Amino acid sequence: MDFTTNEDQQALVGLATQILSERATPKRLAELEAAGGWYDEALWQQLASAGIAGAALAEDVGGGGLGLTELALLLEQVGAHVAPVPLLETVLCAALPIDAFGTTEQRQRDLPDVAAGRALLTAALVESGRDDPRRPLTTATADGDGFRLSGVKSCVPFAADARRILVPASTSDSGIVLALVDPTAAGVTIRPQTATSGQPQGEVELADVAVAAGDVLVGPDRGAEALDWLLDRALVGVAATALGVSGRALAMSATYTTGREQFGRAIATFQAVGHRLADAFVDVEAMRLTTLQAVWLLDAGLPAATEVAVAKWWACEGGHRVAHAAQHVHGGVGVDVEYPLSRYFRWSKQLEMTLGAAPAQLLRIGSTLATEPA
């Protein structure tokens, strides 16, 4: 198990870092927020032009043919710059499963436009009242060669702007269907929601929505397997983004405390401050190690259910502690919503809760351990 990045990966990350550093500046983010926006379409177009948006998609749909490892490294940089682009939501959670499980027609219909930055896709993985996204309450009833979907999905990123929404639903015989839903289809109602980070989301109500056979990504025979595949990658994608957020929040704290003086000395020299940041450093490195381990196993096609849950647990618990430590050592500046650290705090809180907070991950780890032979 080797976590060392190669030259190609370093070059990819370097390119992404350069673009994000130049375009996702605190000033630019403040301008977007002041204008009532969040998604930076111009930045996303630039990332697409550089081959970053489609890096993990297959070459025959305009992608770079790279793997989950490279995508996780890119997501870390998105988190480090709190960049308002849909790399996690569109590429990892929606385009990647279409690339993996879709027919030639399904793949060619939308993925070239995703790689080129011309289309947004999203996935509806969250439901109110259901802690486990692997067992959706939304139902899929057979209708000829297709299905009819009924249910309510919550916190769907970019729901109103997406070309297609990937929707998991349960059949009457405990099967799972992954369907591609047009947000403008009859029976679809989208109510605006706003995430902690400011990201536009939506509550998506499906009222007997017809899904033709050509829009069924995975049928009941392989649906549960495909949903597990998707959620494992979505969770490590969240963990990778959280790693970037926490790592940059820690770096900002180190810079601030070495420059801020009190009683004639930098406050970083005070034992209480140093210990707080040292604990945060340990949390960040634990987040890094567990995330890379889970990504490596998934990329190698090996079982990783426990490792994925451990990585997300560290993203939740470690990310929570780092966010609060960073805010604490910044003092009054740390709670100023106009100070850049505020975005890192809000992103951290959102990522902590995305697809299951720490207790949900512990439950999954415990369930796995309970079913393993002694």
Tell me what each language-model feature is.
Residues 1-81, 101-104, 117, 142, ...:
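Alpha-helical interface subdomain recognition
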Residues 99-102, 141, 167-170, 180-183, ...:
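Short beta-strand-to-turn element immediately C-terminal to the catalytic PLP-Schiff-base lysine
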Residues 110-112, 128-129, 137-139, 153-157, ...:
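A generic local secondary-structure boundary/capping motif
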Residues 124, 150-189:
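A short core secondary-structure module
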Residues 117-128:
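A short, Trp-centered hydrophobic/proline-enriched beta-strand micro-motif
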Residues 135, 155-156, 182-218:
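Flexible, small-/acidic-enriched active-site or ligand-binding loops
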Residues 85-105:
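N-terminal glycine-rich flavin-associated loop
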Residues 66-67, 132-135, 158-162:
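Short glycine/proline-enriched turns and hinge-like loops at secondary-structure junctions
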